[in-house]
Amino acid sequence: LVQVAAALPDAIRKLVLVDPVIMPREAYQRPSDFSATSEMVGKRRNSWDGPDAMFERFRDRHPYVLWDPAVLRDYCEYGLLPDGEGGFELACPPKTEASVYATSLTVDPWPLIEHIGQPVTVLRAPQIAPGKTFDFASSPTPPTLADSFADGTDIYLPDLTHFMPMQDPRRIAELIIFG
């Protein structure tokens, strides 16, 4: 979205970035090795008997236990495709998701941010505490990100995680629509 807003400013009236995966500036100067994360994501279970089996597997597991149950149900219902052999597989295969992590630092958004004049609202969850183990639920968003936009507003949501749209869809939808 940041790339589109910078390239096509007349096409976007405002931006709402929901706990965006925009790393601190220095991360793009010295890209980290995400191979461990990519490898872990790439090994995620891909085969399921069906949406009910997937729901039962995830409903009590972190981070899915944080999600609104109706959202988790929709994820399980609509996030699977028939595998052609009577079972189901993830619509976004684990290797495809892993490639997102592997290439996440290939485009530095920071030079683009200074060219965005539209109002930008950043919805942000808590970052991982120093010394804690990596958790996909923690925010990758720098607390000062909104300040870097010409017209930026930071909305810190300490009771939510990186999965905020799945945790509290009504609240996030209202913030997107009404600011």
Give the residues covered by each predicted segment.
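Conserved hydrolase catalytic core segment
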Residues: 1-30
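The alpha/beta-hydrolase serine catalytic core
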Residues: 32-65
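Hydrophobic, aromatic-rich cap/lid helix
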Residues: 69-111, 127
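Conserved loop-alpha-helix segment in the C-terminal half of the alpha/beta-hydrolase fold
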Residues: 115-160
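Catalytic histidine-centered segment of alpha/beta-hydrolase-like enzymes
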Residues: 156-170
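Short, amphipathic alpha-helical "lid/cap" segments that border enzyme active or binding sites
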Residues: 169-177
